[in-house]
Amino acid sequence: MNSPKDELTALLALNRIDSIGSIRAKYLYEQLGSAQEIFRNRKHLKEIITGVNQKLIDALDDSGAFIKAEEELRFIEDNNIRCLTPEHEDYPSRLRDCEDAPLLLFTLGNADLNTTRIVSVVGTRKATEYGRRMCNRLISELHSICPDVLIVSGLAYGIDAISHKAALDNQCKTVGVLAHGLDMIYPQRNRDMAKRMLQCGGLV
C-alpha cells in the first residue's frame, strides 16, 4: 500500500526532475494514478503509455531526485508547509483545470484558495506616487464592497508589496505567490510583511 509520506516523497522527486515539465508530469500521473507507480513502472513506460521516449525513462532513473526529495520533505515537515495535490479539496479549483497545473502546491498560512472572490494585482516595480495612491484606493474600495475578497500578488517590489500592505491595512486576506519557493523571502525588506500575511492570508 502506498503511504501518504512515500507518495509525497515520490511526487517531490518527480517535481525535481528538470526535464519533466508540469504538463508531462501531470499526464504520467493521470495515466498511472500515483507518482510511486510512475517510478515503479519506469522501465516499462514505453509499453504502458504512448509518447514515452528513452530520454524520459532515463530521467526517471535519476536517484539524485529522491535524495533531494527527502531533503525537501524534511524542510516541509520542519516548517509546517502544506502540500496540495490536484485531488486535495483545498487545491485551487480554478487552477486544477489548467493544462499545466502543477502536481504540487506548497502553502503557508490560513487563506482559502477557493474563496469566491479573488482579485490578482500586478504592476510595475517602480510605482509612481499616483500608482501607489490608486492601488491603495482600489483595495480599500474593494474591501468596502466585498469584505471577503482575497488579494493575490507576488510579494515583489513596487505594486506587489503595496497591494499586500493595503490589503493588510484594510483587514483583507492576502496571498503572495512566490516565484522562488517558500525557503526564502525576496526582497528581504518584505519579510516582516510576509509574517503578517501568514496570519491574514498566506504564501504559495
Which residue stretches match the model-derived regions?
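Short, small/acidic-rich helices and loops at N termini and domain boundaries
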Residues: M1-E89
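Glycine-biased, small-residue-rich flexible motifs in mid-sequence functional cores and linkers
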Residues: N2-K5, T85-V204
